[in-house]
């Protein structure tokens, strides 16, 4: 594991390990390669129900936002008490997460976007409002510098991105700590576990267990 340099080959290696475990547990991550070049990226798509009677925001706790494996399962259960009053307005949000390698910063970068099923995208303000409350204090000093909209370097489409300027700093601390306790880590797993929850992307604990068992 490189302490000072995280090259693209290392990025692809750790992504491959990550995706192997994802396939074992059916978590939906896959690797895609651009047709015009050899560059590739890791990606996942998931659907959530947004209940507007409970919250107007995206990225709220799992009790409000329910992850859906497919587009078909979009109906909300209705009990007798709900029949006697107007049904809550529910909308389905499609979330796309892409993990790419940044040659400039030499670290992985999380690109993401969210849209309704009719294709209407969520605005940057909606994305920021959907950031979980426990992460907002850390980002409030510069939310628009932390979550920005950029062109996807491979797809050429607008995506939101978590700026990678601090990635090397906090990942160096993570890697040094893992060395002290002689623990094997997958760079992508450790990094995504830290940055993913900021935008509603959570990894099952089995990823960390799989990394430890691969020593």
UniProtKB/Swiss-Prot annotation:
Effect noted on mutating residue 165 to S: Instead of the formation of an intermediate complex with a thiol ester bond between ATG10 (E2-like enzyme) and ATG12 (substrate), a stable complex with an O-ester bond is formed. Does not affect ATG12 conjugation to ATG3
GO MF, one annotated term: Atg12 transferase activity
Keywords: Autophagy, Cytoplasm, Protein transport, Transferase, Transport, Ubl conjugation pathway
Gene Ontology annotations of biological process type: autophagy; protein transport
Top-level taxon of the source organism: Eukaryota
Disulfide bonds, paired cysteine numbers: none
Job description of the protein: E2-like enzyme involved in autophagy. Acts as an E2-like enzyme that catalyzes the conjugation of ATG12 to ATG5. ATG12 conjugation to ATG5 is required for autophagy. Likely serves as an ATG5-recognition molecule. Not involved in ATG12 conjugation to ATG3. Plays a role in adenovirus-mediated cell lysis.
Protein name, per record: Ubiquitin-like-conjugating enzyme ATG10
Species name: Mus musculus (Mouse)
């Amino acid at each position: 594991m490189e302490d000072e340099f995280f090259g693209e080959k290392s990025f692809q290696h750790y992504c491959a390990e990550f995706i192997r475990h994802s396939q074992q547990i059916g978590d939906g991550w896959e690797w895609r390669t651009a047709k015009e070049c050899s560059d590739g990226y890791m990606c996942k798509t998931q659907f959530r129900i947004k209940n507007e009677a409970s919250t107007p925001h995206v990225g709220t706790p799992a009790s409000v936002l329910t992850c859906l494996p497919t587009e078909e399962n979009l109906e909300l259960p209705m009990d007798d008490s709900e029949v006697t009053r107007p049904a809550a307005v529910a909308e389905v949000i499609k979330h796309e997460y892409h993990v790419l390698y940044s040659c400039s910063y030499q670290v992985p970068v999380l690109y993401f976007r969210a849209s309704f099923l009719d294709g209407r995208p969520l605005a940057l303000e909606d994305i920021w409002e959907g950031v979980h409350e426990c992460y907002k204090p850390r980002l409030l000093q510069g939310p628009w510098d932390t979550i920005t909209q950029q062109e996807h370097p491979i797809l050429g489409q607008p995506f939101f991105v978590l700026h990678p300027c601090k990635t090397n700093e906090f990942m160096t601390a993570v890697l040094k700590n893992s060395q002290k306790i002689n623990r094997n880590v997958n760079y992508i797993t450790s990094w995504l576990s830290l940055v993913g929850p900021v935008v509603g992307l959570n990894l099952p604990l089995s990823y960390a267990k799989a990394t430890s068992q691969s020593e």
